[in-house]
Amino acid sequence: MTRPVLVMMRPLPLPLLRANGEEIEVRQFQGDFSLFEGATVLCSTALDRVDADFIAAIPDSVKLIANMGTGYDNIDLVAATEKGIKITNTPVVAEDTADLAFLLILASARQLTANQKFLRAGHWTSTQPATHIGKTAHGTTLGIVGFGQIGQAVARRAKGFNMNVIYHGPRRKPAAEKLLDATYFETLEEMLATADIVSLNCALTAQTKHIINAQTLSAMKSDAVLVNTGRGALIDEAALVDAMNAGHLSAAGLDVFEYEPDIHPGLLELDNVTLAPHIGAATAQCHEAIGACAIENILAQFEGRELISCVDP
């Protein structure tokens, strides 16, 4: 029996893996495509670009790309599908990402970054009122763009803050609406004009790239808060910087960036923007769940079982 071979795009701690009683050989990719000889599975992360050229360079023996993360916009799905390669993801990050989204909602609304900077600089020298006054989050209208697992998890948290939840997406979700007392808006602009706080939780596609741009930003309330824990390229960052410098929007909270780890310098200069280095899934428990999900898909491929989280092409 041929020994099963797994190629890793980056070094990740894995337990000893066996498929059908055979130990899986794990190879670390470092630019040499000859390492793929005899390989059946490639394991990648959201930080690894698996484009059409990369897919063309790997042998036909590769039948699965097991991507670690919910998003898979780093992979050329068309090229993979045409080559007969299946894609799996790890959709186990919803609750942790929703936690971070709500952290950014509260931190941004209450101007935490500006107030922390004020304190750390030693300017808090008396019982004077806070220099940077925030806005109330509870009881406001929260607009969610993308009402999948993560968007709905954000909505569940919002109900605890007595928020009015509205959402926009490519299709209505009546069951989720009823469960979460949420209202669907067919047009993005109408939802943006209604929301006090906007949370981006949709996937990055050709249709959603720069879904927040100069035009849609102008549709938002002038004192609105914008939060993004989806993908950085959902926002035209230059347009966001221009809008905030013009006093449009009271605050923003961003965990993801279009060209991360590079960040638009204008964002770094704004005290009313709370920034995080893509930590939506950065908890020990979530990392463990991601690894377990990826491993289960990898073993399923080697053992001829059904994949647990196969992505539709």
Give residue spans per PLM region.
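Rossmann-like adenosine-cofactor binding region
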Residues: 50-52, 172-266
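C-terminal helix-to-coil terminal segments
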Residues: 16, 89-100, 127-133, 260-313
